[in-house]
Amino acid sequence: MKQLNILLVALLGLTAVSAQASVANAEKLIMIYTTQAKAANPEYTGPTVADGKFFFNRKIKLGNGKEMACASCHTANPADNGKHVATRKVIQPLSPAVNAKRFADFEKVEAKFTQHCTDIIGSDCTPAEKASYITYVLTEKTPSAKK
């Protein structure tokens, strides 16, 4: 029994370290996107939670007349599981505090931004939008069921 408790403590510790690493990766992505945004616009002052939250919840009218937002699939709380509006497939939380795999791979993050921004907005998101989006997602650490 004592060995099981030690194993559980070790596993919980690894999960915490993994979540911290994912948050650190997200922060690195924010720095990369902020640098890109400043290169494109020297007057850019940096990402904000307010801009990220607005971008995340902003409804955009699609060609079929329906409105979509990031929150349409990812829910209003990025720490919650989402559900794809078309396939109904469960989407793991965006918040790296809850989902240690989120923001772990820069190429995957960039590919998802390109795919989803093009599908919804009609073009890739700007580096400033990406930086603010991730900044906002980092603030949501608690799933709704636990609030």
Could you describe each region identified by the protein language model?
Residues K2-F54, A97-K147:
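Post-cleavage N-terminal segment of exported redox proteins
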Residues K53-M68:
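Local sequence-structure signature of Cys/Sec-based thiol-disulfide redox active-site neighborhoods
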Residues I60, H74-N81, L138-T142:
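Short alpha-helix boundary/capping elements
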Residues K66-M68, V85, A128:
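Residue-level detector of alpha-helical recognition elements and their boundaries
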Residues E67-N77, Y133:
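The canonical Cys-X-X-Cys-His
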Residues G82-K89:
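Short cysteine/histidine-rich zinc-coordinating motifs and their immediately flanking basic loops
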Residues Q92-L94:
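Short glycine/proline- and charge-enriched loop/turn segments
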